[in-house]
Amino acid sequence: MSRDHEVGSDNGAGEGAGADMTVRIFVTGGTFDKEYDELRGTLSFQHSHVQEMLQRGRCHLEVKIEEIMMLDSLDMTSTHRATISRACQECAESAIVITHGTDTMVETARALAANFRGKTIVLTGAMIPYAFGSSDGLFNLGSALSFVQVLAPGVYVAMNGRCFAWDNVRKNRELGVFEAMVE
């Protein structure tokens, strides 16, 4: 499944970081895009909320959104990671944000880091679905979009206002946060 959307306009930023940059956003699912199915009493996927989030956040960046899968990251396989890697490789943009489930985000970051040089890739997600009013997703997406504009090429994880290199991050399941493995 692949859907493209273009969002953004000239924000009058002029010269400087990100002034002429287009950011590619790849949607892969995860808690970020889950919704509560009242009939089944479960969380499921209906559609991505990324475009709505960008509008709500009054984002003025030029972005191209592509939904490449809607998957719980616990169900993600090496084949899915290869699909994400191929999408990153084939896109023209050098600044990429990937929305991803938090359970295996670090594994995907590791897989991408093995294959990429010259592009800045930032993975982000949410602990609570955006469809729930208390989600951290909007903040995390905004943070990732900011980080991707200023970081050196490489692979990163951005969660809850912090940004980590792919090889120095873990999900602390007890605290429900991402943290550096070595400070």
Predicted segments with their positions:
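Active-site histidine-anchored catalytic micro-motif
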Residues: 18-183
